[in-house]
Amino acid sequence: AVAARKSKTPIRTFAIGMQKDAIDLKYAKEVADYIGSEHTEVIITKEDVLSALEDVIGLLGTFDITTIRASIGMYLVCKAIHEQTDIRVLLTGEISDELFGYKYTDFAPSAQAFQKESEKRVRELHMYDVLRADRCISVNSLEARVPFGDLDFVRYVMAIDPEKKQNVYRKGKYMLR
């Protein structure tokens, strides 16, 4: 939102999803409308996913289903950005899940358990998420900037009282919102 306000021209935003039950597309559109971005939805089909599967597995060098599932969308949206635009540098939301929670922290039994899980995921970022994202982005001749990965920002968020980060409002990543 800050970048959109400061920019003289509308920033470009992208979201990917399938037509059916596209809740992420809905929320991305709401944000895009709110900040006034030039928004592009990349609608994919089951066939698109299946046809990209072999490329993504080869790219990642793993058959781990969680890693592959998390990579297909990023790979396909980056492919679309490369093929349909002249954009070559992206801002991503990578690492926000690890810092502010997602499905795995929505039901943490306590704030301390939430914090412990966040710390574990931040420590393991380089092994999974950063590598996965870098490969999916760079194979499509794009570069990523990851503002949530700024070390000072990570330290700041990790130092926040876990009670304040725990999802008691039933809104994912509510502190980030």
What are these regions (language model features)?
Residues 1-177:
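ATP-dependent adenylate-handling active sites, centered on carboxylate activation for C-N bond formation
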